[in-house]
Amino acid sequence: HERFFQSPMLEATFGGGEANVAVSLANYGMDAEFLTILPQNDIADACIRELRYFGVGTKKIVRGEGRMGIYYLEGGANQLPSKVVYDRAYSSIALAKPGDIDWDKAFEGVDWFHITGITPAISESAMELSLESVKEAKKRNITVSCDLNYRKNLWKYGKKASEVMREMAK
């Protein structure tokens, strides 16, 4: 249980709130499609391959500018708590804004849409896109579920989580 940079190695895996839900659903034999905006680079390509490996559909992923968002997890041990460092600035989803997703295409054949409180916490424009996604889903009579997934260290752009999540839950 080494602390950050006590080891010369970092282990890289793909994950994230909504992606983890999609993988879990696919593991239970349910159809799951992942909707997000990813950069056009080899790391994003590897992420897409990983989702496909677990049976998650990726045809609704939009490719855009920016980079992959990263978080670093330092596992805790005994009295030392776990620690997470988020590096989401300039990621594709942090740069995403309303209008970047074709909702007719994204929600075609969809009857359930799941979102977490992590995406709207990343940036103000990602928050606006998140609110747009929920409104567009409801407009199409798609069931919306939301895991608040509060991450204090992500809410840095001036809006409070309680304010935004209340709006998403309407």
Label every PLM stretch briefly:
Residues 20-31:
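Alpha-helix C-terminal capping segments
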Residues 1-3:
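Positively charged, low-complexity intrinsically disordered leader regions
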Residues 14-18, 43:
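Conserved donor sugar-nucleotide recognition element shared by glycan-biosynthetic enzymes
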Residues 31-117:
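Conserved N-terminal subdomain of the carbohydrate kinase-like
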Residues 29, 55, 139-141:
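Glycine-centered short loops/turns at secondary-structure junctions
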Residues 112, 118-170:
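Conserved beta-alpha-beta core of the PfkB/ribokinase-like small-molecule kinase fold
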Residues 5-15:
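Short pre-catalytic strand/loop immediately N-terminal to key active-site residues, enriched for Gly-Thr
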